[in-house]
Structures are given as structure tokens and as C-alpha cells.
């Protein structure tokens, strides 16, 4: 019976780890569902505001040079839309990251501005129903 206590601890640890892994999976699945619903709301909002969706899940490429060696990297955007003769690349966000105050969002939008040949970048806040046209100017 000396083995019973360590075995019980082992089973308890295993159950705790399994519970935590299941919780992470459920949280990620919930985030994916929220993202899909937000994307659908954002696409409807863009259409309602007069934008025509040309493509969804757009892929662009950028060359990065490190010490003279070239590397090509893919850049993924949520949509490419047109309004009149102007084309825009679109990033759709939900929650707190839907603001340019969020550093990751700002960097992502700047990457789009450098990668895609469009008239501008649109940030769509799916939760608030807001479309913002984003522009950049270097100050230093």
C-alpha cells in the first residue's frame, strides 16, 4: 500500500493536466467561433456601406533582406474590397485589439500598407460596427 499515495498524486496530476488542456481547447474553439462571426458581421457591414468584396483571405508577399540574404514571406489579410475606383485591404478585428492603440494591430496594418498595392487600409471593428480608414506618415 505504500504505492497508493504516489499513484493517487500521479492520477491527480494527470487529471489536472487533462482538464487544463481541455479548457485551452475550448477557449481556442470559442475564439475561432467569435472570429468567424465577427468576420461575417464585418463583411455585411462593408457591403452595407457600399464596398464590394473582391476577395477574402488575401495573400501577399514581401521580400525581407537580412545581411544581404533575401527571404520571402507571406502576408495574410482578411479581405480586399473596392468602393468606386479605389481598392482597400481590410483587417477585421473584434474585442480590445480592434483599435490602433493596440501595438500588434498597428504593426499589422503598417505591414499591409507596405505589402499590398491599394489606396488604403481599412480597420473594421466588428463588435462596434465601425470602419476606419488608416493612413501612416513617418515623422522621424
Language-model regions, residue ranges each:
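Interdomain/boundary linker segments immediately adjacent to catalytic/signaling cores
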Residues: 1-45
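Short, flexible active-site-adjacent loop segments at beta-strand->alpha-helix junctions, enriched
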Residues: 20-21, 85, 127
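Surface-exposed cleft-lining segments at the edges of enzyme active sites
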Residues: 25-29, 67-68, 96-97
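Active-site metal-binding core of divalent-cation-utilizing nuclease and nuclease-like domains
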Residues: 31-35, 45, 52-87
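Amphipathic coiled-coil/heptad-repeat helices and related helical stalk/stem segments
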Residues: 39, 72, 105-108
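Nucleic-acid nuclease catalytic cores
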Residues: 82, 93-140
Amino acid at each position: 500500500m505504500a504505492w497508493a499515495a504516489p499513484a493517487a498524486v500521479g492520477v491527480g496530476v494527470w487529471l489536472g493536466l487533462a482538464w487544463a488542456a481541455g479548457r485551452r481547447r475550448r477557449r481556442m474553439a470559442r475564439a475561432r467561433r467569435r472570429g468567424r462571426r465577427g468576420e461575417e458581421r464585418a463583411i455585411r457591414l462593408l457591403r452595407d456601406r457600399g464596398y464590394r468584396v473582391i476577395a477574402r483571405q488575401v495573400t501577399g508577399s514581401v521580400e525581407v533582406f537580412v545581411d544581404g540574404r533575401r527571404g520571402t514571406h507571406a502576408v495574410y489579410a482578411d479581405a480586399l474590397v473596392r468602393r468606386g475606383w479605389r481598392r482597400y485591404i481590410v483587417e477585421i478585428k473584434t474585442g480590445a485589439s480592434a483599435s490602433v492603440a493596440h501595438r500588434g494591430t498597428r504593426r499589422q496594418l503598417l505591414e499591409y500598407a507596405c505589402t499590398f498595392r491599394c489606396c488604403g487600409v481599412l480597420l473594421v471593428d466588428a463588435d462596434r460596427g465601425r470602419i476606419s480608414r488608416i493612413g501612416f506618415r513617418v515623422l522621424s
